[in-house]
Amino acid sequence: MRYTGKVVGGLIGLALGPLGAVVGVLLGHQVDEHLDKQDASLPPPEELTAISERFFRATFRVMGYLAKADGRVSEQEISAARAVMAELRLDSARVQQAIECFTAGKQPGFDLAGELAALARACAGRPDLVRVFAEIQVRAALSGNNLDGPVRPLMNRVASRLGVSPFEMAQIEAVLRIRGGSFRHASAGAEPRISDAEKLAQAYKVLEAAPGDADQDIVKAYRRQLSRHHPDKLKANGLPESMIEHAKQRTQQIIEAYELIRQRRGI
């Protein structure tokens, strides 16, 4: 039997108080049961390794391509790419690979269509992996102040080829802008001062829910988001080990958002 979900859920929940720990363990248990049922259908280790490598290389190649979309790569965009590598806690060998991939993506002859087609094949049946890929690209663009101009429509086209709609991309951007969604902001640890009403509105965005939703719909939205970003599930589907930290941060943000809404509603 798997216990990682319960442990992760409980530890994160403890930061929210005793009740948060209980809720975290219960939901973690549900995710663990779901993952146990999936184990029999998981691809063999060598296939997961291939998926992981494809995902890693595509992440930084496409990041380099998007950084060059306006004709040049600024120092800010280079710093943003390095911030991605730092937050993902890559070792020196992986950093060098990431730099090589980023540089390859900047080249005039880079085959974006081929890269995306290969990634789409690797992630077939794994929409949560594709969403993590989109989130990382948006966060990098936010870090480099590079999401406006030609980058946004180009990023939407990239996402579309992977099955992510412009509406979903807008949702991702809205969520990542909460509490400063860039990699540089996350590493700096500073948070903007916002009102309680704004915090609550942001919490609904994190869950992709609305204030008018019924309590049971809020709980369903919470569980859906928690399952989508669960580190164990993503890792089992081929997410590189180096990118699990991103999933953990999103999971904590989801739990904090639900706890705020739960307290306000008295769920």
Model-assigned labels for residue ranges:
Residues M1-Y65, E75-H229, K233-I267:
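Small-residue-enriched hydrophobic alpha-helices in membranes
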